[in-house]
């Protein structure tokens, strides 16, 4: 009887470790810990309430934000069967995933051919504040500089790495368009089903705009990034409508 109980306990412990490992491949470890703590507290109180995801939200400062996508992906998909496209994307994103640890980068998500990553939210130099505090902003100059340098290095490695992955059928290298920005954001989980870790804020929107208005095989960065990493060979972009609307001066880095 005792032997059977011990076996059940060991099996339960093993399953819990597997579940946590699986969750930590989807959500940041700190978020998983908070979710499990909520669940444990409700179990002790014999409650069965829904997870309160709003309590997990945090405000981050000095964050580097990256958006990257494939040039000509839509036309490529029309020429190649879906399975080959999926294999190609998996091979390419595996390269990017492997680079994350080298540069203190956290992959937030992939949406189709778009790859979103940050430094300073889960990894890197973190400056965190409760979302309820809005009347002060912590000093982040050192953290911003460190995070921006790591993100620029990661972006360069992404462009180099993408050139090594060939598109099926066409046999041409993948070309990236990369956008970078630095600033603040709010992180958290929205909703109570199909949990997804998300970033929100104006600076996230600007990073996405840097990618959309970028140049193939180059890194398109806001002036805020350039000021933090001035040692790179940045070239000021021509003023275009998107830049005027957002009020952001931007620069290109050839890789």
Set out the residue ranges of the language-model regions.
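Short amphipathic alpha-helical segments
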Residues: 32, 89-94, 159, 207, ...
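Catalytic core of nucleotidyl cyclases, primarily class III adenylyl/guanylyl cyclases
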Residues: 68, 99-153, 160-204, 228, ...
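Cytosolic regulatory/linker segments at or just downstream of nucleotide-handling modules
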Residues: 185-187, 194, 207, 213-255
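Short, well-ordered loop/turn elements at secondary-structure boundaries
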Residues: 60-62, 181, 213-215
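Juxtacatalytic helix/coil linker segments
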Residues: 2-111, 126
């Amino acid at each position: 009887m005792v032997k059977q109980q011990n076996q059940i306990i060991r099996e339960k412990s093993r399953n819990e470790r597997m579940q946590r490992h699986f969750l930590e491949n989807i959500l940041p470890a700190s978020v998983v810990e908070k979710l499990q703590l909520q669940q444990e507290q409700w179990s002790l109180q014999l409650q069965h309430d829904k997870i309160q995801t709003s309590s997990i939200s945090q405000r981050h400062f000095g964050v580097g934000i990256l958006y990257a996508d494939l040039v000509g992906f839509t036309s490529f998909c029309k020429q190649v069967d879906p399975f080959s496209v999926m294999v190609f994307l998996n091979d390419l994103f595996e390269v990017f995933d492997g680079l994350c640890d080298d540069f203190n980068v956290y992959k937030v998500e992939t949406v189709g051919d778009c790859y979103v990553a940050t430094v300073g939210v889960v990894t890197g130099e973190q400056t965190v504040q409760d979302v309820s505090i809005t009347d002060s902003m912590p000093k982040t100059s050192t953290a911003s500089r460190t995070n921006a340098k790591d993100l620029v290095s990661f972006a360069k490695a992404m462009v180099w790495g993408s050139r090594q992955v060939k598109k099926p059928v066409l046999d041409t290298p993948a070309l990236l368009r990369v956008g970078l920005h630095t600033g603040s954001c709010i992180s958290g989980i929205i909703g109570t089903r199909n949990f997804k870790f998300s970033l929100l804020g104006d600076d996230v929107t600007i990073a996405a705009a840097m990618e959309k208005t970028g140049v193939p095989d180059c890194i398109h960065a806001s002036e805020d990034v350039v000021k933090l990493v001035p040692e790179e060979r940045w070239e000021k972009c021509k003023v275009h409508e998107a830049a005027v609307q957002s009020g952001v001066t931007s620069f290109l880095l050839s890789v």
